[in-house]
Amino acid sequence: MAIIKLRGVLVDILVEMAPDFYKSYATTDKKGVKQLLVQCQNALYGTMVASLLYYRKFTKSLTEIGFDLNPYDPCVANKMIEGKQMTICFHVDDCKLSHRTPKVMDKMIKWLRQEYESIFKDGSGEMTVSRGKVHTYLGMTLDYTVRGQVKITMIGYVDEILTAFDKADPKGRGTKTSAAPENLFKIDEDCEKLPPNKAVEFHNLVAKTLSATKRATPDTYTAIAFLTTRERTPQKDDWTKLVHLMKYLRGTRTLPLILSANGSGILKWWVDASFA
């Protein structure tokens, strides 16, 4: 059982959607902010409380069968099985498992089905399993075809960003060889602000690109780091800088992030600095 407190605009939305159901339960706190208390019999998917409850349950299940949580990443668990390490990386209920022995993987998958698979009346809820060298995980394509390295791409997701951008700015075609213009950090305080509808498009495109930046396109970090600071009151200059970034994404949509390790303990990073 969980208690969820909804506040502000979200309460207004719920009351507007179903006034007969929610209106009588909506109250205000001491500061005059609208609030709505909801008691859930089960964790409600999509809320912070639900994610936390599931995390506690899942990590408890793993530690009970001998897994240790990684001290540097609480969403990674390890266990030595038959002399080899099994690693489970998880994002809520999306898990990535690895072990040298296929039979060990079979047993772990069977355990996960027994503990967490729930088949609903409509037949949905079945746990899906992908095995092999190439996987789709959290929007990323993880390619382990080359021994000792992983190639990460998000081509489909980047295409979605570019499709949304083309609708917002049909004239923004073409490509760029750098992710950011030379005047990226220059702000003209007198520049005209974007109209509300354009500001929403700016916010959506920046947010979508940020997700790709964190996972597969770190070469866009500098540009997206600046643009995220401009979301509250974006100007036309900011849109021009976003257009530059979108053109770079179009030209590098298939460029992979390649990670590998050789045991030296030395971190090396190769970048194209021709535009620096």
Regions from the PLM with identified roles:
Residues 1-276:
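Long, low-complexity, charge-biased intrinsically disordered regions
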